[in-house]
Amino acid sequence: MPETETKTGGLPYHEIRFPYDPRRRSVWKAICRYLQPWVASDEGLLELGAGYGEFSREICAARKWALEQNGALVQHWAVSVTPLIQSAMDPWPLADRSLGTVFASNFFEHFTLEQGEEILTQAARVLRPGGRLIVVQPNFRLEPRRYFDDYTHRTAYTDNGFRDFLRALGWEIAHAEPRFLPFTMKNRLPTAEWLVRTYLALPFRPRAGQFLIVAEKPGSLK
């Protein structure tokens, strides 16, 4: 969830940009099946900007936390997920080196570069050495014309740029896919789980506009 929730009595961000759609659950089932090999199922996991909680609902992990500043969205979450209702810029109430995975989807573009660095520093703190940061992100290189249609987007990232950003902060890149998912789910693309799984199995994914990066925390990163 962006850190720019309406303060003037207007509609909340999610109602404008991403109203709840139960069909997304089947999409996220397929996405989580694809991402599960990078997620340690016997360790803790944190989802950043969890929104409707689709990822944390479907992914397998020993214990799951989800950070979201809009507390009204928690009603959609699985009961197995521990909510952290706060800004990502505030200290996270999680112990050092206590998690195996931190996940963020469509998240970092809502922050300045400096804020993103602060968030990544917190992610490094809570991950154990060798723990993974998984990021799904709009790819400005593939979707420059629509990237700023979302009025809360602050920073433009390409797949190469975000990889270099992570490397500059000490992360090691374990896996990267410049063309991972379509730019948005706000269209008439099929949402059946088997179709999404078929799409993810394609060597070239048409209409892809988001990238996937999996980074690992080296032992030297605090």
Each model region followed by its residue ranges:
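Conserved N-terminal segment of class I S-adenosyl-L-methionine
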Residues: 1-97, 101-103, 117-120, 208-211, ...
